[in-house]
A protein has these predicted regions:
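Short, hydrophobic/aromatic-rich segments at coil-to-beta transitions
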Residues: 42-46, 103-104
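C-terminal catalytic lobe of FAD-dependent flavoproteins
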Residues: 9-11, 15, 19, 74-78, ...
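Active-site-adjacent segment of FAD-dependent monooxygenases/related oxidoreductases
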Residues: 1-7
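Conserved N-terminal helical subregion
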Residues: 14-22, 30-33
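A conserved short coil-to-beta-strand element within the FAD-binding core of flavoproteins
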Residues: 29-44
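Core beta-strand elements of the Rossmann-like FAD/NAD(P) dinucleotide-binding domain
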Residues: 52-63, 67
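Short, surface-exposed charged micro-motifs
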Residues: 26, 35, 60, 116-118, ...
Length: 253
């Protein structure tokens, strides 16, 4: 069921960071890699923007993994100019739950392009999504839904649920995200691009991109194992360790 893949993404990210710190890692918030440290053509670390200075903070590392999503090509361009990422935008609408009080995930095909559109409950509201189109805007500007996407999602909902028709005045809010899809020369239709993840190694820089949040552990495992040749004392990584769910109710979380 689709409901098995529903997750609070912000909590998931924080949990992963907490697990990393507990294992001896260091998390540096509000930091941005401005350039790669190169020695004899090989990546040996990164330079972080220093909010309190102009020189930047130089960090050396045995292995550097570029897991920057839709921005992956921007960093990778310093060692390989080949473009691999096709940024695709997915947008959602949020409406009051009483207008469509679903208790599980419902899916249907859009009447125009036969793409899957989902309606599901979330935090006391109902969400309608998603779209799938090339995101040609500046990646440094937060992505947002456009008018055509709003019409697209409203049409899908109203065709599927003629007894619960809605309009723009019913929309509480919306959000949009940019998918780091691996581009191909064979597909012009965004929805026909493969959603697999891929890992590349360029002059010591490991880049991982693509995939879906539901397979984030496998994606991380493949990226870590790709870095093994640069970590001579490390053992092959495994996916045996799992998160231990806290003994709390949903309200206590």
């Amino acid at each position: 069921a689709y409901s098995y893949a529903m997750v609070d993404d912000s909590r998931l990210v924080l949990r992963v960071l907490q697990e990393s710190i507990s294992a001896g890692g260091t998390a540096i918030n509000y930091s941005k890699v401005s350039e790669l440290l190169l020695e004899e053509g090989q990546v040996q670390g990164v330079v972080l923007n220093d909010p309190e200075g102009s020189d930047g903070i130089r960090l050396r590392a045995a292995a550097v993994i570029n897991a920057t999503g839709a921005w992956a090509d921007r960093l990778r361009n310093q060692v390989n100019p080949e473009k691999r990422i096709r940024p695709l935008r997915g947008s959602h609408l949020i409406i009051p739950r009483n207008l469509m009080p679903v208790t599980d995930v419902l899916t249907s095909l859009h009447p125009d392009d036969k793409r899957g559109v989902y309606v599901y409950p979330w935090e006391g509201t109902t969400v309608i999504g998603t779209t799938d189109l090339d995101h040609d805007e500046d990646l440094d500007i937060e992505a947002s839904i456009n008018n055509a996407e709003v019409d697209y999602l409203l049409q899908a909902f109203n065709v599927q649920f003629p007894g619960h028709t809605i309009s723009r005045v019913d929309i509480i809010s919306s959000w949009a995200g940019v998918r780091p899809v691996i581009g191909s020369e064979s597909s012009k239709d965004p929805s026909k691009e493969r959603r697999d993840h891929a890992v590349w190694s360029d002059n010591g820089l490991i880049t991982v991109s693509g995939g879906k949040l539901t397979t984030f552990r496998l994606i991380a495992l493949d990226a870590l194992n790709a870095a093994l040749p640069q970590l001579p004392n490390a053992k092959p990584f495994s996916d045996e360790r799992v998160f231990i769910a806290p003994d709390l109710t949903a309200k206590e979380l």
